[in-house]
A protein has these predicted regions:
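Alpha-helical scaffold segments
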Residues: 1-505
Length: 505
């Protein structure tokens, strides 16, 4: 019965009076589902919190609770959510900054618009995790001050703060101009030198695998450099020297930056690490000359990532299509192709090129229809979900290529109800096609009834509003709890049946 209640709680057609009745009897799981409804009134939200206090934070985040509804002493999570939305009472911050739970003070440190005195208190918190959280979110001036904090973990958080001044980020990256850190999370609790094992036997240990300290807080310093390299506010002149750094992860992060000078990009293109070259290959900052050179990279992932670069020349992309498993997603450069380029690719002799083009969903009708009649099944599968294809063309695609294109045809938004029903009658059944039919907004009862027996398509069909109401009601007692829950969530479930379900509770 519980799964039926979960479905009912999510049903968008549940009348307001039945929402009230369900709130009154909801267990914790059902209350959580109810809290996610888009149609809750303020009064219902207050009643739901009274029924299950754990929903307060979710409801506050949804804007359904006000400061008048919340006591920060009993609902600190909800109070913190309202503070972060700048909808809470500022005095709450002065109360919560003294909260004995570290996680609550950490959450407070992440809130926007805190009073200055609260930020001062957080910056001096006895638990470094609170100070580090503040450092990640705080203002430029306070970030500059916290960059000199004696604990390396705080400095690492400053390095990730995009509001930190560029000069401060440069200093954190290079270490120049800052006093040495005195502590890190490793030497806080372990005698040094220490390297945390990959498989730690202590259940209460929260150090990450491989974290280490030899007295120089080496793993935290390395992490600080990683954060600074990832931070777009770190100035270019500070990062370029890391192109030859012995740490491969640092070169990974450098290779993804959008501000790389040409000579640094060229050096990274010859990096011994394929991961570095792959991150560089997808970087929109590299020019056409380097892209052409990298197209011959021996590593498959480098070439695959290069194909996703939005500035890859189409002739290079065509070459990559024949040598690299690129995948089925629409590539940025293909999406940006001009009408002239689209026409050239449609006439390409290479089916891989035509397949990439067929992923677009805005093709001219004559090109779309030509691709739908392509002799290569991969091209047809790629274009099959394109809007505007006629029923006759979709049926012809199935007739020529069968199971290879069935699911793609079923996903076409213009597929007719009759075609969808015919697709479900294919033998042997194509499960992916059944799932596509069960999701399709144009599916009607004959198609949906055929989908119900399938393990994965069945729950989708049970929740489809075109399913006949008597069938939906019957599914409420189905042995598969997923189908029963989906049926309870079906907006076509008659209100009288909804009321009967609640009457037996």
């Amino acid at each position: 019965m519980h799964h039926v209640l979960y479905g009912l709680a999510a049903n968008v057609a549940l009348p307001p009076e039945l929402v009230d009745r369900l709130i009154a009897v909801a267990d914790a799981a059902t209350a959580g589902v109810l809290a996610g409804r888009d149609d809750l009134t303020h009064e219902q939200a207050v009643a739901l919190v009274a029924r299950d206090p754990d929903t307060a934070q979710q409801l506050a985040h949804a804007g359904l609770l006000t400061a008048a509804d919340i006591d920060p002493a009993t609902h600190p999570d909800a109070a913190l959510t309202l503070l972060d939305r700048r909808a809470g009472d500022p005095e709450w911050a002065r109360l919560l900054v003294r909260d004995p739970l570290v996680r609550n003070r950490q959450s407070l440190a992440a809130c926007a618009g805190l009073p200055p005195d609260v930020m001062e208190t957080l910056a001096a918190d006895p638990d470094v995790r609170v100070v580090a959280e503040l450092a990640f979110w705080t203002t430029p001036d306070r970030a500059a001050a916290l960059a000199r904090h004696p604990h390396a973990e705080v400095r690492r958080s400053v390095a990730a703060n995009e509001a930190a001044p560029p000069a401060v980020l440069a200093a954190l990256l290079t270490g120049e101009g800052l006093p040495p850190a005195r502590w890190c999370l490793v030497c806080d609790r372990e005698d040094t030198p220490f390297v945390h094992p990959r498989e730690c036997p202590r259940p209460d240990c929260d150090l990450l695998p491989g974290e280490s300290c030899d007295g120089s807080h080496d793993s935290t310093v390395h992490g600080t450099r990683q954060q600074a390299l990832r931070n777009p506010a770190t100035p270019t002149h500070a990062v370029v020297g890391f192109a030859g750094h012995p740490s491969t992860p640092l070169r990974w992060d450098l290779a993804a930056r959008p501000d790389l000078p040409r000579e640094v990009s060229a050096r990274l293109a010859a990096d011994p690490s394929p991961r570095v070259r792959a991150d560089l290959a997808e970087n929109p900052a590299i020019g056409a000359t380097l892209i052409r050179a990298m197209a011959d990279d021996p590593d498959h992932d480098v070439r695959r990532r290069l194909a996703r670069n939005p500035h890859v020349p189409l002739d290079v992309l065509a070459r990559l299509a024949g040598t690299t498993r690129i995948g089925s997603a629409l590539l940025p450069r293909v999406a940006a192709a001009t009408p002239h380029e689209v026409g050239e690719w449609a006439r390409s002799a290479d089916p891989e090129v035509r397949t990439l083009l067929a992923q677009r969903r805005d093709l001219p009708a004559e090109i779309r229809d030509a691709l739908a009649a392509d002799p290569d099944a991969k091209v047809v599968k790629s274009v099959a979900p394109h809007p505007g294809l006629s029923d006759g063309r979709l049926r012809a695609m199935v007739g020529r290529h069968g199971v290879r294109v069935l699911a793609a045809v079923a996903a076409n938004p213009d597929a007719t109800p009759a075609l969808l029903a015919d697709l479900t009658r294919h033998r042997p059944p194509v499960q992916k096609a059944l799932r596509a039919v069960a999701r399709h907004p144009r599916a009607t009862a004959p198609a949906l009834l055929a989908c119900l027996a399938d393990r994965d398509a069945g729950p989708l069909a049970a929740g489809h509003p075109a399913l006949p109401p008597p069938v939906i009601a019957e599914l409420l007692t189905d042995t598969d709890p997923r189908r029963a829950e989906a049926a309870a969530a079906n907006p076509s479930l008659p209100p009288a049946v909804m009321s009967e379900l609640l009457a037996v509770l």
